[in-house]
């Protein structure tokens, strides 16, 4: 690599779902690497959730970041006039099990993004769920299968990155580690029952590092499972959170052959990652309890 050349090699990216778990960490990763980011998501400035308000406050008035509501046609026009080195689509939470937004709406936005990528000849990176390759039928699998199908209909260079359970600061409140930590901070018992995919676990910032490095990598086209390369990591996390009794069953590692497995290089130690999530949740306890 030439001196001064960036690994990611990008100057401007578009992130659809800039306030989701992966999307928000990806925004921060890009800014840290000096990459300009245009972000779209559902929230409008005057009707934001408290958590998303806080997320945008933390980015602050950064010259590298521009946010538009996905419903804002003027915002879309600005986006469609720009040139991007890579586009990321992460409008759905890959670990969510139910209560999804209207899928027609999501597929409509995906279509619009595919058109943009076709016109500008830019690679589209889709964040999907590892459950798509599972034999079990779930709402998560059904939904992400549809999104992946929608992507294949276009004439666009794409990578689909299927992720397992993710953890770290800003983990969504419907997730098990979040619920356990919140219960511990409030000195209450956790009655939350896990429906999470327990086959593997990744720290969200490690995933974003990989996505930044490979955003425009055209050797990486197709469908990939991003994995830790370690055994029973989710279960180990449950043990560290003293919740062994809430581990229902080991998810069998059965995946379809459509995706290639990639063990990501950067692998944050589990204890360190959990401590980061704990420190974050201590700091924002009132926000999460509200």
Question: Where are the regions a protein language model picked out?
Answer:
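Substrate-binding strand-loop-helix patch
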Residues: 169-172, 195-210, 223-243, 267-272, ...
